[in-house]
Amino acid sequence: MTRYYWCDDKTKEKIEEESQDDGGVTPIILMGGPDGPPPGSAMDCIDVSDNVIMFYGEVSEKNAKVLNKAIRMIDKDLQVFKVKYDSEPPPIKLHINSYGGSVFAGFSTVDVILNCKTPVHTYIDGSAASAATLISVVGDKRFIYEHSHMLIHQLSSAMWGKFEDFKDEMENLDLLMTKIKKIYKEKTSMSTRQITEILKRDKWFDAEKCVELGLVDEIVENG
């Protein structure tokens, strides 16, 4: 499927006219076949259509690889669009419905979004918890639907070993928690003390509370 980006009818007509000569705009091809993505695969929970990405799944290394690739490729295409048609491209719209997962996978997507030249708007569809909130809060504009919720909490870890191994693990967790708190401090309206207290709990916040805490900018109301 050929993908088009436009901001007005005039630009749309120009793209359609030129695409007849050069074979169309190069599509993004991630993976899959005629029967769609295999169940449980990364593309089973990541869907790309034009400048919209639907991410409904775990924040894992496998899923982050596909998600990051999609964001980078759309960003590249939209920057080509900007130069070629001298028109501001639409933002990348990233819809998130995820209970979280790996903090390292989340950090990788955070860096991809922060390095995008095209604005990335994040939308909470249903829920965003744990590592998924790190991804959502770094968007240039952050939206949440009326009946959606968010949850932020401390890191979890399980291990066995010698006493020194546990000391090393605590140092590792302290390092990661410092980075997590830094992201929330920079991207929300919460104070350091407030962040520390909230992270101690496993408590869901509704859309109104998310706006109050600065986790999102705006509620998308129904109707």
Predicted ranges, named:
Residues M1-A131, V138-G223:
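N-terminal organellar transit peptides
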